[in-house]
A protein has these predicted regions:
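Charge-rich, solvent-exposed alpha-helical interaction surfaces
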Residues: 30-37, 54-65, 80-84, 88-92, ...
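C-terminal structured domain segments
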Residues: 425-439
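Surface-exposed polar/charged interaction patches
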Residues: 37, 41-44, 61-72, 87, ...
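Long, internal scaffold/assembly segments composed of regular secondary structure
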Residues: 224-359
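Long, low-complexity, charged/polar intrinsically disordered regions in eukaryotic proteins
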Residues: 342-427
Length: 439
């Protein structure tokens, strides 16, 4: 039985734990939204162009550039322009489907590439929020990355810098976006939150700092590809570590628990290698923790809400301590919240299911009833599916950049596995050694 809660009645996502609203994401679109946040210093951005960008409209942009004398031969070679846009500059959804194909955005090759995007096809479900939050923890790394990404564009005058050399595709992106406008809004609460797993955030920023050592040595396409791989890799590590550690933190009533998380990775291409069973067991163990992670998140959310209602400090650390030491499960606050959910159900059948789900709990144990109800609701049950989809996406499963792999056969379930491009990226950054000054 699944209790159907109304949209917005209860929220699972907690930016103080993980900013991501875990769903299937595309890492290129995540980078597009991340670049927008880096450009706007975390503020929301309103784009001036409200109409949908299409292949035809972008070809017209190029024609207008020819009218201004900025490019030559576009009108006489429209097929070549379209091929260039499709293959080199654009992210497309349903690529190749004549009916369903739509423009998502420009490829994330430059800081300003976000200006051409159709937002409904460029959703990242707050994944860029998490990455920006982590980057913001090290202003030096964030500033250096921004400086690299904005190359060829003057942020103070909002114009191109002709003296800075760029590759053809990135230059094309700048010409397509140079006349477009945007408006920065105010910062949101999400951007003010700090990463929950500080040590994992430090590792992420250290890897980005190492990658930036190659900024003048690698072609821009290769650098951006490495950046995408590292972002996906660290999103996966951060999420899996949170899934593993959060239930332990709730049990301990503190954020200070032993971080003994690990992942066995099969480095072979053999599905039946000797290490494959151990890699499968580790991946299965992570999946088996989804339920306790979802429950722990609900526990923290409810305790934070209670602390806010009483005017107390509602940080995650205080919520953990409250759940362990001060929580009263018969608190009338949870009784009223539970009753409000019941009253909001659509019909008598739903209320009957509500009562059946909670019939074996102690009568006055309103807190555990509420948590269990949320687990059994549409909000809770979808989290298990979406969390797996999110991890499959950020680990780039079954690609050359993968951290996870599986096959269609039940004999070969999901396992940790390292793709050649991920290995290449990690080797490149690990070749660098710190000097005597620690830089």
């Amino acid at each position: 039985m699944i209790i159907k809660l109304k949209k917005g009645e209860v929220v699972f996502r907690n930016p103080e734990l993980l900013a991501v609203d875990t769903k299937m994401v595309n890492l290129d679109r995540v980078l597009t939204n991340l670049f927008m946040q880096i450009y706007s210093v975390g503020a929301p951005v309103s784009l001036a162009v409200k109409t949908e960008h299409k292949i035809e409209s972008l070809i017209n942009y190029v024609k207008n550039l020819e009218d201004k004398g900025l490019v030559h031969g576009a009108k006489a070679n429209q097929d070549a322009v379209e091929d260039w846009l499709r293959s080199n500059l654009l992210e497309l959804v349903n690529r190749g489907n004549v009916v369903k194909e739509k423009v998502s955005s420009l490829k994330p090759m430059h800081l300003m590439s976000f200006r051409v995007q159709n937002r409904k096809y460029c959703r990242d479900y707050n994944t860029a929020d998490q990455l920006y939050m982590m980057l913001k923890a090290n202003p030096g790394v964030l500033g250096e990355l921004k400086e690299y990404l904005r190359k060829g564009w003057d942020l103070s005058t909002n114009s191109m810098i002709g003296s800075e050399e760029l590759d053809v595709d990135t230059t094309g992106i700048l010409y397509l976006t140079k006349e477009l406008k945007d408006k920065k809004g105010l910062n949101t609460d999400t951007k003010d939150a700090k990463p929950f797993l500080e040590k994992q955030t430090e590792l992420f920023n250290d890897d980005i700092r190492r990658l930036l050592e190659y900024k003048d040595k690698l072609p821009r396409t290769v650098f951006i590809d490495y950046l995408k791989i590292l972002c996906g890799f660290h999103l996966a590590l951060y999420t899996m570590k949170l899934v593993y550690l959060l239930p332990k933190m709730v049990d301990a009533g503190s954020k200070d628990v032993v971080d003994d998380w690990s992942l066995v990775v099969d480095m072979t291409d053999n599905l039946d290698s000797k290490v494959a069973p151990y890699a499968c067991q580790d991946a299965e163990h992570i999946a088996n923790l989804y339920r306790s992670y979802v429950r722990s998140t609900f526990v923290i959310n409810l305790c934070q809400n209670r602390l806010k209602a009483s005017g107390a400090n509602a940080s995650v650390e205080n919520a953990l301590a409250y759940a362990k030491n001060e929580l009263k499960k018969d608190d009338s606050y949870y009784e009223f919240a539970l009753q409000a959910v019941r009253n909001g159900l659509e019909d008598d059948d739903a209320r009957k299911e509500f009562d059946e789900i909670l019939q074996y709990f102690d009568r006055n144990d309103y807190f555990d009833k509420y948590v269990h109800l949320l687990e059994k609701s549409n909000l809770g049950t979808t989290q298990y599916k979406y969390l797996g989809q999110f991890l499959d996406a950020v680990t780039m499963k079954n690609t050359t950049s993968m951290l996870f792999a599986d096959s269609r056969s039940k004999r070969h379930p999901r396992r940790g596995a390292m793709g050649s491009k991920l290995l290449e990226t990690l080797v490149q950054i690990l070749l660098l050694q710190k000097d005597e000054n620690g830089s």
